[in-house]
UniProtKB/Swiss-Prot annotation:
Its cofactor is Mg(2+). It comes from Pseudomonas entomophila (strain L48). Keywords: Hydrolase, Magnesium, Metal-binding, Nucleotide metabolism. This is Deoxyuridine 5'-triphosphate nucleotidohydrolase. This enzyme is involved in nucleotide metabolism: it produces dUMP, the immediate precursor of thymidine nucleotides and it decreases the intracellular concentration of dUTP so that uracil cannot be incorporated into DNA. Belongs to the dUTPase family. One of its GO terms (biological process) is dUTP catabolic process. The keyword Chaperone does not apply. Substrate binds at R70, S71, G72, N83, L87, I88, D89, M97. It comes from the Bacteria. Its EC number is 3.6.1.23. The gene is dut. It catalyses: dUTP + H2O = dUMP + diphosphate + H(+). Pathway: Pyrimidine metabolism; dUMP biosynthesis; dUMP from dCTP (dUTP route): step 2/2.
């Protein structure tokens, strides 16, 4: 398990609301909560930045974090991440904010302390470009967007 430095930016986190934690021993994501001042209605088509009351510092350039949606919010209520995935670089130290987008047809109320997203750690491999005149030929070549078939 990797140690992750964290700052509590909202005093309710860790007292009124639990710190991010894994729901089960097999969980990949730490639940992030909406540390709002009041319950907030997210209208259809609306996107809002929701504070989590937490900042983290990963520190290891071989790791990054991703903020991912919670499947139940998207499937049951149409609430997903406005940026689809939030990428947290290893040297970022600001508050974790969650962009919530209501793609549904009905208003959705985000309640104070509600679990709205999850944070996962992922390995990072940085690359550099080797500029070439042409690539070694492959069977696929430049075919994309369904080129390999549907079955």
């Amino acid at each position: 398990m990797h140690a992750l430095q964290a700052k509590i930016l909202d005093p309710r986190l860790g007292t009124e609301f639990p710190l991010p934690q894994y729901a089960t021993p097999g969980s990949a994501g730490l639940d992030l909560r909406a540390l709002l001042k009041e319950d907030t209605v997210l209208e259809p088509g609306q996107t809002l930045l929701i504070p989590t009351g937490l900042s983290v510092y990963i520190g290891d350039p071989g790791l990054a974090a991703m903020i991912l949606p919670r499947s139940g919010l998207g499937h049951k209520h149409g609430v997903v991440l406005g940026n689809l995935v939030g990428l947290i670089d290893s040297d970022y130290q600001g508050e974790l904010m969650v962009s919530c987008w209501n793609r549904g047809n009905t208003p959705f109320t985000i309640t104070i302390g509600e679990r709205i997203a999850q944070l996962i750690l992922v390995p990072v491999v940085q690359a550099h470009f080797d500029i070439v005149e042409q690539f070694d030929e492959t069977q696929r070549g430049t075919g994309g967007f369904g080129h390999s078939g549907t079955r």
